[in-house]
A protein has these predicted regions:
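Short, low-complexity disordered leader/linker segments with a strong preference
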Residues: 1-25, 56-60, 89, 384-392
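Beta-alpha junction/loop-to-helix N-cap segments that form part of ligand/metal-binding clefts
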Residues: 11-19, 38-45, 57-129, 138, ...
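Extracytoplasmic "Venus flytrap"
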Residues: 19-20, 27-48, 71-77, 100-102, ...
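Periplasmic-binding protein-like
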Residues: 28-30, 87-101, 119-121, 162-165, ...
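An alpha-beta-alpha
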Residues: 135-199, 218
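Extracellular/periplasmic bilobed ligand-binding domains
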Residues: 177-275
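Extracellular/periplasmic periplasmic-binding protein-like sensory domains
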Residues: 235-315, 370-371, 376, 384-386
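Segments of small-molecule ligand-sensing domains
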Residues: 296-312, 322-377
Length: 392
């Protein structure tokens, strides 16, 4: 069951009454619009599919139906707070989201003050959970991801890096700086150029000209899906032949459509999941069937049935809340769900799911993929210690 709320609907942000009847509400706090809308909706698809697989849960011997309450945080920090307040007022018992660390950070205090736990799927900036006992996440963090990509770049023979990031974007600046710091510490490696651009900027010629002049082996450009297609094309049109790498947000086929398949050949990224993982075969088969059986879902997934990592994370975030609810004793409150989440441990489709003292997932490995012939090709796993295991 899915219910949609809209930012702007009057809301004080006050918690609704305690759970009544046989329905529990889980909030979906994701961007449906704005620069992160495409990725956000892929994460939503994972949660929607999870709700189809497990539409109810038994708590204290009573079965409850799960209703998803969706809001659009618009990829905007101000709108995110309003969206979070609307979820609180709707009576959700827990929240999933968000794709985009900035909006997650912005809304974090709203959920904390209302004592409603949130489980992020792909919000990787450390600030999301830091100091907030009500925020959890099922993904790895940017310090880990930045180090992983620096290790991969070094393993690929790249010794000079140009780093380009978006001003004011917590994800982009955070991941860029973690990559730069890790890369500069590696033997024979140096960051030869650092550039920044503003939100909604579309002309990157000045930045790319300066980056090209520094003669890098690799450009590391953590950005939104929208920006990625533009900047890759402009870089290749300018004659930049260096490797191009980024983080998890770039696992979206729209990028290749917008930049041109030939321009994206060899672009590398880190991500959380590979659909060819045999341990997740049941999920992959079921999710593909869901996409192919629902025209709207297939369209939101870019009109293909490739399983995005963020969809798998959205699925795992939902299942983490279900596992927590199973272990609630006494009244079903946000505080009780939070306490149960802290000790959750189960096998998710993206790996084993458990949380450390900060609410962060215990993850030690990233999947490396490259864009090749218009598709994402899994090439191996990378750890922060430099260990790279090629795909079989």
């Amino acid at each position: 069951m899915i219910c949609a709320l809209f930012a702007g609907c009057g809301s004080s942000g006050s918690p609704a009454a305690a759970v009544e009847g046989d329905v529990l509400k889980i909030g979906i706090f994701e961007p449906a619009t704005g620069e992160n809308g495409a990725g956000g909706m892929q994460e939503v698809l994972g949660a929607r599919y999870a709700n189809k697989v497990v539409p109810s849960v038994t708590v204290n011997g009573k079965e409850y139906k799960i209703e998803l309450v969706e809001v659009d945080n618009q990829s905007d920090k101000t709108a995110a707070v309003t969206a979070a307040q609307n979820l609180v007022s709707s009576g959700v018992i827990a929240v999933i989201g968000s794709y985009g660390s900035g909006v997650s950070i912005a809304a974090g205090s709203t959920f904390e003050q209302a004592k409603i736990p949130a489980v992020g799927g792909s919000c990787t900036n450390p600030q999301v959970t830091l100091g907030n006992d009500y925020y959890f996440r099922v993904c790895f963090l940017d310090p880990f991801q930045g180090t992983v990509m620096a290790s991969y770049a070094n393993n690929e023979g790249c010794k000079k890096a140009a780093v380009i990031m978006q001003n004011g974007d917590d994800y982009s600046t955070g991941l860029a700086n973690y990559f730069a710091d890790a890369f500069a510490e590696m033997d024979g490696c140096e960051v030869v150029y650092t550039g920044t651009y503003n939100t909604n900027e579309t002309d990157f010629n000045a930045i790319l000209t300066a980056a090209k002049a520094a003669d890098p082996d690799v450009l590391f450009i953590p950005s939104s899906i929208t920006t990625a297609g533009i900047i890759i094309k402009q870089a290749r049109d300018m004659g930049i032949t260096a490797r191009i790498m980024a983080g998890d947000t770039w696992e979206n086929a729209t990028i290749m459509e917008n930049a041109g398949v030939e321009n994206c050949e060899g672009v590398a990224l880190s991500t959380f999941f590979d659909e060819n993982d045999t341990d997740a075969s049941e999920f992959v088969q079921g999710f593909k069937a869901y996409l192919n059986g629902d025209a709207e879902a297939l369209k939101l997934n870019g009109n293909n049935d490739t399983v995005a990592a963020v969809s798998a994370l959205g699925y795992d975030a939902y299942m983490a809340i279900i596992e927590a609810l199973k272990n609630v004793s006494g009244d079903i409150t946000g505080e009780a769900v939070r306490d149960a989440l802290a000790s959750v441990s189960f096998d998710g489709v993206t790996g084993s799911i458990s949380f450390d003292e900060n609410g962060d997932a215990n993850k030690d490995m990233a999947y490396i993929k490259i864009m090749s012939d218009g598709a994402f090709k899994f090439v191996g796993t990378q750890k922060t210690d430099g260990t790279f295991t090629p795909a079989a």
